[in-house]
Design a protein with these regions (language model features):
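Gly/Pro/Ser/Thr-rich low-complexity, intrinsically disordered segments predominantly at protein N-termini
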Residues: 1-201
Length: 201
């Protein structure tokens, strides 16, 4: 782990937003501006497939699909003066957030965040994870394209608890979206199969 320079002046949200929007693939993490890892085709495919899966949840509840959520992809979310992130996919429950979050950065704490690991995986697994926990994000998913795995984490007082670990080839029900079976392989290039049985996670 790289040592932090105690004399460094912390960056601010204003410093982050000063980067031109079309060039801003950056995050403010613990007072430092860091560029997100380069998006590989595997990362992009996983992100696209996750957005397709969550489509069933993005409407008002009570219709054909479960609904009940707002979602955003690469939305800037502000937590505190030292931390503004761009999670790969972010969700807010409609029963808590009446209107779709707008503007940038969004200042409403998410109910669910998913990060897809890339070259800066330490940020997702350690530093950003600590912030998500500190601000009470209830659900945290981690998709690892290299290992072809999905980790589903649930908030607890002492830290996130992994309640489900799944790999390519498995079909699971993963909270908070357990109303729909999830074929994990769709994140890693597999076509969705109608006949796949679901196992409880």
């Amino acid at each position: 782990m790289t040592a932090r320079d105690p004399t460094r002046v912390p960056a601010t949200l204003e410093d982050l937003l000063a980067i031109p929007e079309e060039q801003r693939r950056h995050e403010l993490i613990e007072g430092a501006i860091e560029e997100k890892g380069s998006a590989t085709s595997e990362h992009g495919d996983a992100q696209h497939s996750l957005s397709a899966f969550t489509f069933a949840f993005k409407h008002e509840p009570g219709g054909r699909w479960p609904g009940g959520w707002w979602f955003g992809t690469e939305v800037e979310v502000h937590f505190d003066p030292a931390n503004t992130f761009r999670p790969d996919v972010t969700g807010w429950r409609r029963d808590r957030v009446a209107e779709r979050p707008r503007g940038t950065p969004v200042r409403i704490r998410p109910d669910w965040v998913c990060e897809i690991l890339s070259t800066n995986r330490r940020n997702d697994l350690v530093r950003k994870k600590r912030v998500y926990h500190r601000f009470g994000v209830p659900h945290y998913w981690i998709i690892d394209p290299a290992e072809e795995t999905l980790s589903v984490l649930r908030w607890s007082q002492d830290g996130y608890v992994e309640i489900l670990a799944a790999e390519r080839g498995e079909t699971v029900r993963a909270e908070p979206f357990e109303a729909m079976p999830l074929q994990v392989g769709i994140f890693f290039g597999d076509d969705e199969k109608d006949e796949a049985p679901a196992q409880e996670g």
